[in-house]
Regions:
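Generic secondary-structure signature for well-ordered alpha-helical cores
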Residues: 46-49, 82, 131-135, 174-182
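Short hydrophobic/aromatic-enriched beta-strand-loop microsegments
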Residues: 63-69, 111-115, 134-141, 181-188
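Short, glycine-/small-residue-rich phosphate/pyrophosphate-handling segment
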Residues: 122-155, 164-165
Length: 189
C-alpha cells in the first residue's frame, strides 16, 4: 500500500499483513458516519459487530460476523485468515465506554495491525444539537453499569449520561423528582 493509504494490496499472499480496523459509526446511520469510516467500511472484506451496527451500515454482498464479545471477535479473526481487512463496527466514537477497549487487548493475540477510526461522539452530537459547549460536561454511563446520576446532576451544571434501554429515562426522571431535582432541564436524544 502507498504511504498514507488504508488499502492493503496483495502481491504475495503469504506476506500480506492483516489490518483490523475498529470503526466508530457515530449515531448509527450512514449519514452520520464520517467519510473516513464509510471508506473503511467499503474497503473491508468482512464486517463484524452487533446486529444493530451491521444493520446501520448495510452489507451489500459482504460477509458478516455478528457478535459484540471482544474475545470471540478476536478468535474469529484469528481463525479466519482469509479475511485480510476485517472491520469491527462500534457505536459512537470508540472512546467513551466503548467495546474498543477490550478489543485492543483481545487483538494483541492476533497477528495483525490494528487501526482505529473514531466516529462522532454522542455527547458531541447532542451538545451540538442543543447549542451547548461540552468542555464542562460531567460524563456518565449506566449502560451495563451503575452510576450515581442524581449525585452527578446535583454536583454539575451539565451532566451527560448514556442510559440503558427500557424505561431508563422515566426512572431517571422519577429519581430526580424524588431527590428534589424536579427543576432540572432534561434533554433526551
Amino acid at each position: 500500500a502507498s504511504e498514507g493509504s488504508d488499502t492493503v494490496r496483495e502481491t504475495d499472499p503469504g506476506s500480506r499483513k492483516r489490518v483490523v480496523t475498529l470503526i466508530g459509526i457515530g449515531m448509527g446511520t450512514p449519514a452520520g458516519m464520517t467519510a473516513e469510516a464509510a471508506g473503511a467500511v467499503a474497503a473491508s472484506d468482512l464486517l463484524i459487530g452487533a446486529g444493530r451496527m451491521l444493520e446501520a451500515v448495510g452489507n451489500p454482498g459482504r460477509p458478516v460476523y455478528q457478535d459484540y464479545d471482544a474475545q470471540r471477535i478476536a478468535d474469529y479473526i484469528r481463525t479466519h485468515p482469509e479475511y485480510v481487512r476485517p472491520a469491527v463496527l462500534l457505536s459512537g466514537d470508540i472512546g467513551f465506554y466503548s467495546g474498543a477497549k477490550k478489543l485492543y487487548e483481545a487483538l494483541e493475540q492476533v497477528d495483525c495491525e490494528v487501526r482505529s477510526i473514531c466516529g462522532i461522539s454522542s455527547v458531541v452530537y447532542l451538545c451540538g444539537k442543543l447549542h451547548l459547549s461540552w468542555e464542562d460536561v460531567c460524563l456518565k454511563s449506566t449502560h451495563g453499569r451503575k452510576a450515581n446520576l442524581v449525585g452527578a446532576v446535583r454536583s454539575h451544571e451539565k451532566t451527560f449520561a448514556i442510559l440503558s434501554g427500557g424505561d431508563s429515562v422515566g426512572q431517571l426522571c422519577r429519581e430526580l423528582q424524588e431527590y428534589g431535582l424536579s427543576h432540572v432541564r432534561l434533554s433526551v436524544g
